[in-house]
């Protein structure tokens, strides 16, 4: 009679397999979680890190937690991902510096058994799930505010940002609205301010020099918009208004400031977003996949009219 192939397996391999099974079972517990995001100098990403750490410690009080800033450098973030995986992180929340460029690092992490949740922005490479604001909705809300304020006619600029899906979706959402209003003239839409205050100041300074008359500015996030506002002050320009995205503390303060050109911001909730991402990741570690691999969190437009009722980000 032919001996079954499994019986030919050496005893040492069978013993090794017996040792591996409990190890894999133990890995289903959240033991080491990490976040890598674009810029921990941005309060938005600080809240993502805080929300993730709080939820991770709710899931497992003994969890090891790491938060890193990629500074929007995909090569830096690639190294961070590889180092996190090699150090034993079994859950990584990824705020991609480049949604396409980070794909190889995501694939390596997945191959090593690490659960990867894209947070705030999408990422290629086979992430387990994506948790982010409805960024297209944010762009649509911002653009509709501009159209309504200008009665459908005016000259505007879009101050763009890094090549990540959240920014791309916001701009696409804004263009959805602007294209329905042919008397809205977009004078610039491709200048990358890096998602930062300093970048907004730099790009807007150049745009003000190139455009002697503007009616409105759509900045892809609040730090960019605040930088644009500073550029306007330095150039002694005040004929236009600015709309951002985030609902950040600085954005809310700008809405309350009489001297600011900042007028509206679709509000996100980075703390709650990160908590949801950790919750989803912890369940995936247990073998429970979410009903949808993309979870979109609605945004709400905050303006000068309702900012006093705005409670701000979850803390």
Show the residue positions of the predicted features.
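Bacterial N-terminal signal peptides
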Residues: 10-18, 22
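A residue-level marker of the well-folded mature domains of exported/periplasmic proteins
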Residues: 4, 24-315
């Amino acid at each position: 009679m032919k001996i079954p192939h499994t019986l030919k397996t050496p005893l040492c391999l069978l013993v090794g397999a017996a040792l591996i099974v409990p190890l894999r079972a133990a890995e289903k517990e959240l033991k080491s979680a990490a976040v890598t995001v674009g810029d921990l100098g941005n309060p938005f990403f600080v809240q993502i890190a805080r929300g993730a750490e709080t939820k991770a410690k709710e899931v497992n009080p003994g969890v090891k937690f790491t938060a890193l800033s990629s500074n929007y450098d995909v090569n830096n973030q690639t190294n961070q991902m590889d180092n996190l995986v090699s150090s034993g992180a079994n859950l990584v929340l990824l705020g991609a510096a480049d949604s396409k460029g980070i794909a190889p690092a995501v694939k390596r992490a997945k191959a090593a058994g690490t659960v990867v949740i894209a947070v705030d922005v999408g990422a290629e490479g086979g992430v387990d799930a994506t948790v982010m604001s409805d960024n297209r909705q944010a762009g649509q809300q911002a653009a509709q505010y501009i159209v309504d304020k200008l009665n459908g006619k005016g000259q505007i600029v879009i101050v763009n940002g890094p090549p990540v899906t959240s920014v791309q979706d916001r701009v696409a959402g804004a263009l959805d609205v602007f294209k329905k209003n042919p008397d809205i003239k977009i004078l610039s839409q491709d200048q990358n301010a890096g998602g930062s205050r300093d970048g907004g100041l730099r790009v807007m300074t150049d745009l003000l020099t190139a455009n002697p008359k503007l009616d409105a500015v759509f900045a892809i996030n609040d730090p960019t918009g605040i930088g644009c506002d500073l550029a306007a002050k330095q150039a002694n320009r005040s004929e236009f208004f600015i709309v951002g995205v985030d609902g950040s503390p600085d954005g809310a303060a700008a809405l309350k400031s009489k001297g600011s050109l900042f007028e509206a911001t679709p509000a996100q909730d980075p703390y709650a977003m990160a908590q949801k991402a950790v919750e989803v990741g912890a369940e995936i570690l247990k073998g429970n996949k979410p009903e949808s691999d993309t979870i979109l969190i609605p945004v709400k437009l905050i303006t000068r009219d309702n900012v006093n009722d705005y409670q701000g980000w979850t803390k």
